[in-house]
Amino acid sequence: MKHQVLLPLLVTTAIIAGSVGVYTHSKPLLGQSQDQVLPPFTPPLQNGHIDLQGKYIVSTLDQVNATHINIYANYNGPEASYAMPKNKLITHILVSIVINDVNQLGIKITDRTYRHFEVPYSNLFPHDKVFNFPANNQFDITLPKRGEAFYLTIKRKDTGEVVFDTNNQFFVYSDLYHEFTVAMQNEFIYGLGERRNKQFLYDSGEYTFLNKDQYESVADGHPDQQTYGTHPMYLRRENSGNFHVVFLRNYNSIQAVYSKGKSLTYKVVGGLLEFKIFLGDKSPETSLKLYHSYVNGFNLHPFWAHGFHQCRWGYKTSEMMTTVWDTFNTNGLPFDTIWSDIDYMKDLTDFTIDTSRYDKAQMNTMLDRSVAAGVHWVPIIDAGIALGDVSNERGKELGVYQKSNKTGEDLIGCVWPGKVNYPDFNHPLSQEFWAEGLMNLTKNYGITPSGFWIDMNEFSNFINGEISEDQNCIMPGDTTTNPNYLGNSVEDFYTRIPFEVGGADHPQQEKTMSYDAPKYNYADAKTVYIPNYELREFDFHNLNGFSEGIATNYALKKMGNKLPFIISRSQIAGSGQFVQHWTGDNGSQWDFLQYSLGEIFNFNMYGIPMTGADICGFAQNTTAELCARWMQVGAFYPFSRNHNSNDTIPQEPYAFPDSTYVLDSSKKSLRLRYALLKQYYSHFVSSNGVGTVFRPTFFNFPDDASLLTNDQQFMIGDSLLGQPVLVQSATPARFSHSSYLTFPSSGAFYDFVTDVATLNAQRYTNANNGQIKNVKFDDIMPLYIREGYTVFTQLASTALRSRLLDSNFELHVALAKSGTSYTAKGKFITIQDYSDDNLIQKCIGANNCSFDIQVTGVVNGANLDLTIQIAGESAQTNFETINVNKIIPYAADLKFAASTATFTISKNGTINASIPLQAAQQE
């Protein structure tokens, strides 16, 4: 047993039914009456740490081998506890340092006498993939001597720069609370999420890692602005220009106190202290790819999901949805998927469809993808299962619900349908229960989803803790209060702790289930099994949404979806192998539009690149100008979806009859997305689950210090630069806005136009910085192709669905001059069929369908002669024939007379082509 609890715990017994451990409870936790209300409690460490009288003194240094050392240290002070009597001070610690690869190092701090919650080393969770243990590595480690206080200093060997330093920093390791500080050598730190930052580069403040249902949260340095996910990693740029990633492998509640450019303090409530350090080079991608591999990378989403999505809370009937579908089609707006919020459910209950409002025939007409107009459908699913529903009874039969430590029965929370039970996704039958429920949408109602949107999965709860069966829920908008809910009426060991993450305004036990709720913890558990340990919500909370994502992924595969598409609100480091993400409830305000790029940058760093923000904003009424600008940039989010609340005005692109520029801009922007769709998607395919796709500009130009704080433009891969308008026009009557150009200090870019090929586009460099570009409300945002790179596009003006795009392409070649020749390079994929089956068979894992393209041009009289080299990424690259119907060239000192040349790509080899020059350019 881990905790020496001052309160009697529930008696837990295992009743074996087949191979499943069924856990029951013999009595409630406390003998106190359930109407006892305790006085307010302030955790003793809430306003800062309490100094220790002693330190952890090294007793033994055990050199296991050249790349593994153990440090044993003992606390030499008089204290037996820290901050409060029940929080035992851990007096004997073991620090294990292992270098498992030339650029990867692990630090694990454990106690030698008490058992803490430890994230398993299973395929579900982050774990090492490489075990080279090289004696010749990139790390220079300074350790204390015997008799000295414990510390660590880790440097990059070739530059001598410090990457991890705890010397002279406060450190405490106790039963319920750890505090650990790392010195920062400069201010260039990114990551630490999930959160919605005012800027991509971090400012000083307190930042919380706790999966929480928190509406329109914006991180401002106060600890109460947590959001839906936990990613305790950061990317730091060293003074030499090299990058590294540090990850804290802990999924308990954490609060980080950052002093800009000075230090980062981790305040950790439970679990272990385990750090992983990944040394990269001067490209941020290098260290991030190492990190992504460690957290198991990201799975590929289906091609159709890369199209545009339309959603709102407020599509109350299938007739409303078909009207949206019809109007999109009539206006020539490309889109692939229509979504349903909770409106489609009967009585807001999971696994049901209200057939009085959602007509099967209407829905299936819309979802008939055997005809050109058919689309996909993605409905929302919440975590709570309504009491009294047939699905709830099925869950009770299987015994899969979360138990209450206070009543011994299924824990009762409150969400949209009222009283609910939550599945314990650690239970071995939970995945089958969940799959059965999701499949009932087809089995019982004859309507088949293509993916799922899993929401409220932190788990969210409209009350704090739980209620008993004879109590009523307080729902949003209710003015009554009930202080006697079980979650806050009796003392709970797990809510009266030394430090509470989130601060006084939004404490960690707010809006979720009781932290003392027991989790299934037998050998057949689905997510976590910790032998001889009392596994509770206290430790498992941040894993709820992760575990539901695994179950939903399993369900979709069981339904025949080879590449599951799941948009999950809650996520952790490692969720990308199962789900995708949207950034949650935002506001229809210019600020939220500006924040959105940084949010998506973060999730590309976290390893969940298929992420987007609610386009035009979720809450409050949008405006025509804001929606037009948001559609311009949102059309290029990895996950692109317009979504708003039921109490706001319609904001579909066509919903502004007095401001037709919204429709015009949306149509142009979405058609450009679809023209680029296969090129954009190819970045996800060829990445093989690691690296970023939608990234800040400095990722491609890391030596340009002026870009390190620029979060108002983006790169898609290596080749496309977007400079959206993110501010309101000062002169809206002109229906345009003047933006200042900002380009990297090296390289050059060209205006990028598709649909109508434009020759001799304008070239831009940093010499153009500060110049003004006028961007109209009805236009596409400024988009540029990078000199030295290629981009494949398609004529997408008539293809309103991704599956209608053919295998004919135009090749844009932005040539960089090198001596007397011109060069460009790129990457693409070689398939015609973008179905799940073909992608899996030809492109994923050990399979490969990516090729590199290298273009070299030489002026030859009246032409620019091009040599195009095609090389598959591996000897086994699968080629399907694709057609290039036109080459569109760009070059700084050449003027082209036409864009010509037609060829096919079907194998490795060399292709020759010529582009005619204008007469004045001919030699």
From Swiss-Prot:
Which residues are trimmed away as propeptide when the chain matures? Answer: 18-36
Q: Which GO terms describe its molecular function?
A: alpha-1,4-glucosidase activity; carbohydrate binding
One GO CC annotation, please?
Answer: lysosome
Q: Which reaction does it catalyse?
A: Hydrolysis of terminal, non-reducing (1->4)-linked alpha-D-glucose residues with release of alpha-D-glucose
Q: Which residue positions does the secretion signal occupy?
A: 1-17
* Residues the record marks as active site: D455 (nucleophile), E458, D585 (proton donor)
From the Swiss-Prot or TrEMBL record, state where the protein is found: Lysosome; Secreted
Which PANTHER family does this one have? ALPHA-GLUCOSIDASE, P-TYPE DOMAIN-CONTAINING PROTEIN
Annotated function: Essential for the degradation of glycogen to glucose in lysosomes. Has both alpha-1,4 and alpha-1,6-glucosidase activity.
Name of the molecule in the record: Lysosomal acid alpha-glucosidase
Which organism does this record belong to? Tetrahymena pyriformis
